[in-house]
UniProtKB/Swiss-Prot annotation:
UniProt protein name: 2-C-methyl-D-erythritol 2,4-cyclodiphosphate synthase
Pfam families named among the record's database cross-references: YgbB (PF02542)
EC class (word): lyase
Annotated NCBIfam families: ispF (TIGR00151)
Organism placement in taxonomy: Bacteria, Bacillati, Actinomycetota, Actinomycetes, Mycobacteriales
Gene Ontology biological process terms from the UniProt entry: isopentenyl diphosphate biosynthetic process, methylerythritol 4-phosphate pathway; terpenoid biosynthetic process
Function: Involved in the biosynthesis of isopentenyl diphosphate (IPP) and dimethylallyl diphosphate (DMAPP), two major building blocks of isoprenoid compounds. Catalyzes the conversion of 4-diphosphocytidyl-2-C-methyl-D-erythritol 2-phosphate (CDP-ME2P) to 2-C-methyl-D-erythritol 2,4-cyclodiphosphate (ME-CPP) with a corresponding release of cytidine 5-monophosphate (CMP).
Cofactor note: Binds 1 divalent metal cation per subunit.
CDD domains hit by this protein: MECDP_synthase
Domain of life: Bacteria
Species annotation: Mycobacteroides abscessus (strain ATCC 19977 / DSM 44196 / CCUG 20993 / CIP 104536 / JCM 13569 / NCTC 13031 / TMC 1543 / L948) (Mycobacterium abscessus)
Binding residues for 4-CDP-2-C-methyl-D-erythritol 2-phosphate: D12, V13, H14, H38, S39, D60, V61, G62, T133, T134, T135, D136, R143
UniProt site (Transition state stabilizer): H38, T134
Signal sequence, start to end: none
Length: 158
């Protein structure tokens, strides 16, 4: 009998840093300011990592890539996702699918949604759907002071 699927959720929020490259969904948005962070500040990739780790019961981004781990300083969200994919496989899990929603006014995700979905799906070896929303001017994302992301993931034990 197959094990039941496991679901995880992940969130991430970072303030905008003037002049920092904007990495989001594994993509560079060259005309936008990026987010502060120990790594590249890609809130979507970090939320996906958290969702995958949560679903597999393997901790969270802070435990795996935290500031106490200097080897991960400045690392790309894409590299983090590849590492998490390998960690899940090494622990007997297969990724079924994932979804990530970016919360913020900029950058505009819609024009690059297909590109992001293809990249992220390739990185984790499973379908990833991408969406985006705003907070209608409320909170730090609404004021353009930061970006947030929420992700879910489905995994099964092999």
């Amino acid at each position: 009998m197959n094990a039941l699927p496991r679901v995880g959720i992940g969130t991430d929020v970072h303030p905008i840093e003037e002049g920092k490259p904007c990495w989001l969904l594994g993509l560079l948005f060259s005309d936008e300011n990026g987010c502060e962070g120990h790594s590249d500040g890609d809130v979507a990739a970090h939320a996906l990592c958290d969702a995958l780790l949560s679903a597999a019961g393997l901790g969270d981004v802070g435990a795996v890539f935290g500031t106490g781990r200097p080897e991960w300083t400045g690392v790309s969200g894409a590299k983090m996702l590849s590492h998490v994919r390998d960690l899940l496989h090494d622990n007997g899990f297969q990724i079924g699918n994932a979804a990530v929603q970016v919360i913020g006014n900029r950058p505009k995700v819609g024009p690059r949604r297909a590109e992001a979905q293809e990249l992220l799906s390739g990185l984790i070896g499973a379908p990833v759907s991408v969406s985006a929303t705003t907070t209608d001017g409320l909170g730090l994302t609404g004021r353009g002071e930061g970006l947030a992301a929420v992700a879910t993931a489905l995994v099964t034990a092999l």
